[in-house]
Amino acid sequence: MNMILTLFINITLSLCLISIAFWLPQLNAYTEKASPYECGFDPMSSARLPFSMKFFLVGITFLLFDLEIALLLPLPWAIHSTNSYLTMTVSFMLVSALALGLAYEWLNKGLEWTE
């Protein structure tokens, strides 16, 4: 009962904080918040510089694949556990998901820098 109460309180508090953070900024929307600020001086150039969307997508793809590789780092220690068959099955599924994601990105030309 104590564990269920703790879990319920944590989930309720998290949902309350997320909803407050979502709706609070919408109450005070005015144009001054959207303007750039450079220590009280007039901006030297435009603060809304365009950037390459391809660069952004490749960076996000790298972060996702890097996170999946980081999940495999404790694999040598996990193999020595009592259920190594389960460990190898889960790691094989993780590597398969990584390979399928890479194949999907490759087929959709997500890794092509020039078009």
Curated annotation (Swiss-Prot):
<feature type="transmembrane region" description="Helical">
    <location>
        <begin position="55"/>
        <end position="75"/>
    </location>
</feature>
<dbReference type="GO" id="GO:0030964">
    <property type="term" value="C:NADH dehydrogenase complex"/>
</dbReference>
<protein>
    <recommendedName>
        <fullName>NADH-ubiquinone oxidoreductase chain 3</fullName>
        <ecNumber>7.1.1.2</ecNumber>
    </recommendedName>
</protein>
<comment type="subunit">
    <text>Core subunit of respiratory chain NADH dehydrogenase (Complex I) which is composed of 45 different subunits. Interacts with TMEM186. Interacts with TMEM242.</text>
</comment>
<keyword id="KW-0812">Transmembrane</keyword>
<dbReference type="GO" id="GO:0006120">
    <property type="term" value="P:mitochondrial electron transport, NADH to ubiquinone"/>
</dbReference>
<keyword id="KW-0830">Ubiquinone</keyword>
<keyword id="KW-0249">Electron transport</keyword>
<feature type="transmembrane region" description="Helical">
    <location>
        <begin position="4"/>
        <end position="24"/>
    </location>
</feature>
<keyword id="KW-0813">Transport</keyword>
<comment type="function">
    <text>Core subunit of the mitochondrial membrane respiratory chain NADH dehydrogenase (Complex I) which catalyzes electron transfer from NADH through the respiratory chain, using ubiquinone as an electron acceptor. Essential for the catalytic activity of complex I.</text>
</comment>
<feature type="transmembrane region" description="Helical">
    <location>
        <begin position="84"/>
        <end position="104"/>
    </location>
</feature>
<dbReference type="GO" id="GO:0008137">
    <property type="term" value="F:NADH dehydrogenase (ubiquinone) activity"/>
</dbReference>
<dbReference type="Pfam" id="PF00507">
    <property type="entry name" value="Oxidored_q4"/>
</dbReference>
<keyword id="KW-0520">NAD</keyword>
<keyword id="KW-0496">Mitochondrion</keyword>
<keyword id="KW-1133">Transmembrane helix</keyword>
<keyword id="KW-1278">Translocase</keyword>
<keyword id="KW-0679">Respiratory chain</keyword>
<dbReference type="InterPro" id="IPR038430">
    <property type="entry name" value="NDAH_ubi_oxred_su3_sf"/>
</dbReference>
<dbReference type="InterPro" id="IPR000440">
    <property type="entry name" value="NADH_UbQ/plastoQ_OxRdtase_su3"/>
</dbReference>
<keyword id="KW-0999">Mitochondrion inner membrane</keyword>
<keyword id="KW-0472">Membrane</keyword>
<comment type="similarity">
    <text>Belongs to the complex I subunit 3 family.</text>
</comment>
<dbReference type="GO" id="GO:0005743">
    <property type="term" value="C:mitochondrial inner membrane"/>
</dbReference>
